[in-house]
Each structure stands twice: as structure tokens, then as C-alpha cells.
Amino acid sequence: MITLFNATMSRSTRVLWLLEELGADYELVPVSIRRPDGSGGADPANPHPLAQVPCILDDGELIVESLAIWVHLADSFPEARLAPGLGHPRRAEYVGWLGLATCVFEPLVIAALAGAPTDERQQAARSYLAQRLSAALDRHDWLLWDRFSAVDLIYGSLLRFAPDALGPLPQIDAWLYRMSERPALARVRQQEGRT
């Protein structure tokens, strides 16, 4: 069984959403984390070496960091069809989308939430991301292909925190609406006490 060390309204929320989409059996262990506003703090119940989330235990194996957790979980549940498997012709594209989300897009979202000024490099990255997501959504209802995938979930989870991070784009607004209607997300909201 998978154990998710969960701090409500944090990066672990997206892992909870992924677990729900996968139909996985899991246990939630609530933990406290240091919040950007200075509240909270390290929790001895959290095995993450930096006392952060996300963090899971899967059959006794500690896995930290969103990208590693994403690849591990989506690969562990191939029947959910949320990711192309090893050897699939779109595998590299899938992993590239995930890397772009965690290494480029997430820092932009964090900076936007903090109200930090945008430099030229960040603006170029934001423009590239907006163009790439819009182009993908011009082809399909979802980012990677014609059905929901783990790629949609990671980008959607970031845009739920900062919906204007890429500017107003009709394709992205419609895509976010489709995601907001997913039953797995409704279950996550209920678990976290949100509607």
C-alpha cells in the first residue's frame, strides 16, 4: 500500500489527486510543513529528508519530489492509462512535459504567487509555456493526447494555484474547466475540506 504524507493545500495535493485518478489504495498521513507565510514547521512524522511534501512510501521505499513520484506512480498503474509506458513512442514527450512543469513552470508559479517581479528570462519562459499549452490544446482536449493524462494533472494543479500565470487564454480556460469537473478532483476537494 502507498502512504502519502499529506499537507493540505500543498504540493502533496497533486499527488493525492494522482492517486485518486489512478484508483490506487493509499493511506494518508497528515503532516505539518513550513508554509510560505512562516506558519507550520518540520513534522517528526514526515520522513522527507527536508521535511517537505510531497513524499510517499511505496512498499517501504521512500520516494520524494514530484517528478520522481509522478513517474513512479503512473508507471505502477498502467491500467489507468495516464502515461505512455516505457518504449511507447510518446514516452520522451511525456517525460519532457513533466520536466518542464517541475523545473520551469513551477518556479514561475511560485514567483507569481510571491508577487516577485518578472525578468526577461522568466517572461520568455512564460510566453513559451503559454504557446506550447495553447498549441497542444488546439489539437486535442488534453495536453498529451485525446484523453486526460498525468501531464494534464501536473499542469492543472499548478494553474489551480495561479490561474493567471500564463495570461488569459481561452483554450487553457476551457481545459481547466474540464479538469475541474473530474470526479477524482471532487474527491480530493472533499478530503481537504474544500468545495
Feature map (PLM): residue ranges:
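GST-like fold's C-terminal all-alpha helical module
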Residues: 97-183, 188
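Exported/periplasmic ABC-transporter solute-binding proteins
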Residues: 191-192
